[in-house]
């Protein structure tokens, strides 16, 4: 176990006597999904299949939702949705806890996410993100951010929903960080609504501390820990939209964060 993982998490993981059994049960199912459903999903995402159906019921989008939900179940996660995602072009803004966040939202509605470029190299998640039209950016690059902002506006104007994590990085699930306001300008430029989305992984309305990344923890150690975790809920709350206020993107960011904090029951 990575020594950088929270000190309250590592002892609990070591003392979990059922963890080997969960690995034994879930790993074959995970491999099966990669071997069978992966190629099926790839077939569904080709240009011809993408034209089957219309709106949110295209074969492509249904396959993304199914594949994402199946992947979460491989990790023992029970999806619990509250509220409804807005239809059409929307800027979804969510708190960021885990690499699972993109998969969880995709299980409800496929969207083009803005995500760090490293995710493209991650197994399962990277493939899903790339096929679903994720907009990758290089952290710390002003040029990359400008391109990302322009791409987001173009996608929104074309009717494609976009998802962002305005905190700028994942947290530990015990609080919601400050939302950076700049990304909210894309909703103003494209004249689309902003819908806050609250995410949580745990039981009885409490965030499980073993799901978020530990300090300096890499993807694979976290992936393995989550794979062996006891079953828990994966909550996705679609909240009341935030009114688009010209020249007030900071207020839009604050209101979005406030609604997520209130929904999750965190102190500000």
Predicted segment positions?
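Soluble, non-transmembrane catalytic domains of enzymes that act on hydrophobic metabolites at membranes
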Residues: 1-14, 67-82, 100-102, 178-182, ...
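A transmembrane-helix-recognition feature enriched in membrane-embedded lipid enzymes
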Residues: 12-80, 127-131
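A conditional alpha-helix N-cap/helix-loop micro-motif detector
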Residues: 61, 95, 118, 142-145, ...
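Generic beta-sheet signal
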Residues: 89-94, 116, 137, 160-165, 197-199
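A cross-family acyltransferase "interaction/gating" segment
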Residues: 124-127, 174-255
